[in-house]
Amino acid sequence: LLASSAASDVYKRQVQGVQRALGVDTRIKWPNDAVLNGKKLCGILTEMSAQIDYINYVVIGTGINVNQTEFPEEIAEIATSLAIEMGHPVNRAKIVAAVLEAFEENYEKFLEAGDLSALQEAYEAVLANKDQPVRVLDPKEPFEGVALGITSTGELRVRKEDGTIAEVHSGEVSVRGLYSYV
C-alpha cells in the first residue's frame, strides 16, 4: 500500500507540474498513467522491498513523453507527448522544475498524514477514471463498474454492477475505460 500511495502522490505531482508549466488539462488514469486528451502522457513504475512491519526501500521511476513526435504503431493510438499536444517542442527543464516544485509543496502533507488523506480531494479532482465506467482486468475475477475515487491509501474504489464497492489494489489489475483507453 505504501508503494501505491507513493506512486499516487508522485502522479499527482507530475500532473500538477505539467499543468502549471504548460496550462494543459492533464489527468491521472489510475493506477499508473497520466493522460492528456485521452492518451497516455506519463508512466510510473514502483518497486518495494519490505519485511513484516518494516520497509527496506521504495523506488519510483517515472517518465514523461516530452518532445517525442512519433510512437510505434502498436501504441500510436493511445500515446501522446507534450510536443504533439502543444504543437511545438517543450522545454524539458521547465517541466522538471514545475514537477519538482509541485512535489515539494505537497510532500510535507503526505508525510504528516502518513497516507493520501490530506491530498485525496485534489487527487480525485484530476482522476480521469472518476465517475466513469471501467473494466477491472483482475486475473481472478474481471468485473465492470463505476470508479468512485481512491481510498486514503491509494486503492481505486469501484462500485460493481451488483452495488457492492470493491477496493482495487494497483499491483493486481489493469483498469480500462469501457469505451476507450481511459
Residue ranges and their predicted role:
Residues 1-7, 11:
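Single conserved hydrophobic/aromatic residue that forms the stacking wall/gate
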Residues 12-53, 63:
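Acidic (Asp/Glu) carboxylate-rich active-site/surface patches
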Residues 31, 41-45, 120, 131-133, ...:
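Conserved beta-strand residues within beta-sheet cores
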Residues 53-83:
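Short, acidic (Asp/Glu-rich) active-site segment that either coordinates a divalent metal cofactor
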Residues 75-85, 170-178:
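PP2C/PPM family metal-dependent serine/threonine protein phosphatase catalytic domain
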Residues 85-140, 178-182:
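Conserved, helical-rich catalytic subdomain that frames metal- and/or nucleotide-binding sites
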Residues 130-182:
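Conserved RNA-binding domains used in RNP assembly and mRNA/RNA metabolism
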